[in-house]
Amino acid sequence: MININAGIKDRVINNMAVVNHRGLVGRTVDTSISNSRVLLLTDPNSSIAIKTISNESYSLLRGAEDGVHLVSSFNKNEKMPKIGDLVVTSGSAQVFPSDILVGKITKITKNNFYVLPFVDFKKIDYVQIVETK
């Protein structure tokens, strides 16, 4: 988690998308008058609805145990993703707007695929909070 200097006085509420210039960072989870905590995308407690850009297959992505990658189980009703496919938010969960960059598929196993986020979570200086319509 990270702390940001924006809160209720800035019209920030829980479950707002947080992004930087590289893509999705996470979502607000604990908002006070002037500060908020952000649950990072890489946290194992984080999950987001995503789609691949190439074939628009939909899935649920969560933080992997390594704290770096994101992992998703295959959805048997969707097309198989490929290594190198770009992943964006689907917008279906109504927390994140659609088409925010998330990352790139770097590994596929029998049951899962792994995504390397575009955001460098060790170097987050500035973020923006995105309001969902």
Please give the residue ranges for each predicted region.
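A secondary-structure micro-motif
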Residues: M1-K133
